[in-house]
Amino acid sequence: MGIYENNIIDGKAAAADLLGRLKVVMEGLKEEHGLFPSLVVIIVGDDPASRLYVGNKQRKAEELGINSKTIALPYETTQEELLGIIQELNEDENVHGILVQLPLPKHIDKILIINAIDPEKDVDGFHNANAGKLLTGEMDCMVPCTPQGCIYLIKKVMPVLSSKRAVVIGRSNIVGKPVALLLMYENCTVSILHSATANIEEHCRDAEIIIAAVGKARMVKSEWVSPGAVVIDVGINLITSESKNRFVGDVDFESVRDKVAAITPVPGGVGPMTIAFLLVNTVLGACRQKGIKQYKNIKSSVLQ
């Protein structure tokens, strides 16, 4: 199956295609500049889902040739201890990307930790400095990974986004707000829908692009979407039953898929793209930190 077949956008195939191009670029950077990008992921506590995510990130990084290290800390780690580790990594010229896996234990201030990371090494793109640059349209910054993945997948089936009507369901700092900005920079007409939005179904029916990132299982129904729409499902919700547990998205996939032009599945849609863009950010961050000026051209060649 290719990236797009039978109305389904295959995020795994899209990520593999993107990472294949990134690997070629990395080989050139190693030969020409002696650049070996390095990523450090910090995880605090024993959350099984977080450990699974971190394992997937490290495996993909190693497959690509990125030096990847995981620092696993006990739940009892203090905020001061975590800040100290981050400061050491900030000062280490051989570390190009730092990621603190969320969620963090309640006794640690997430915002403080995110903003302790050097913005140039903030591969998640969550630091206030990066968020501020994105808000003002200064794209020479770390852009959050999942929003980048959403736009990449949309463009695989809808190459020209200018003038398209788009809705984003959800207004989080991680997905909703940044993906709305990216759509706006593509000259879409964007509406952000949330818990206080009246007639949410009507807004969705009027949209040519729907991005669901609200964390409510199967919220978007068939009657919410118009024929020919492109639907990107960011949600991942655990459904438990006596027979088995499984993950579903924010979109009722089975009822929606035959009505729309394209839809991402859960799992296997946006998730692989998030990891792919984490690695893209790591390589681009390494280029910036090492003063490799053609990194903008590198980004264009990877994202073609």
From Swiss-Prot:
This is Bifunctional protein FolD. The keyword Metal-binding does not apply. GO terms for biological process: L-histidine biosynthetic process; methionine biosynthetic process; purine nucleotide biosynthetic process; tetrahydrofolate interconversion. Catalyzes the oxidation of 5,10-methylenetetrahydrofolate to 5,10-methenyltetrahydrofolate and then the hydrolysis of 5,10-methenyltetrahydrofolate to 10-formyltetrahydrofolate. InterPro entries: Aminoacid_DH-like_N_sf (IPR046346), NAD(P)-bd_dom_sf (IPR036291), THF_DH/CycHdrlase (IPR000672), THF_DH/CycHdrlase_cat_dom (IPR020630), THF_DH/CycHdrlase_CS (IPR020867), THF_DH/CycHdrlase_NAD-bd_dom (IPR020631). It catalyses: (6R)-5,10-methylene-5,6,7,8-tetrahydrofolate + NADP(+) = (6R)-5,10-methenyltetrahydrofolate + NADPH; (6R)-5,10-methenyltetrahydrofolate + H2O = (6R)-10-formyltetrahydrofolate + H(+). Belongs to the tetrahydrofolate dehydrogenase/cyclohydrolase family. The gene is folD. NADP(+) binds at residues 170-172, 195, 236. Keywords: Amino-acid biosynthesis, Histidine biosynthesis, Hydrolase, Methionine biosynthesis, Multifunctional enzyme, NADP, One-carbon metabolism, Oxidoreductase, Purine biosynthesis. One of its GO terms (cellular component) is cytosol.
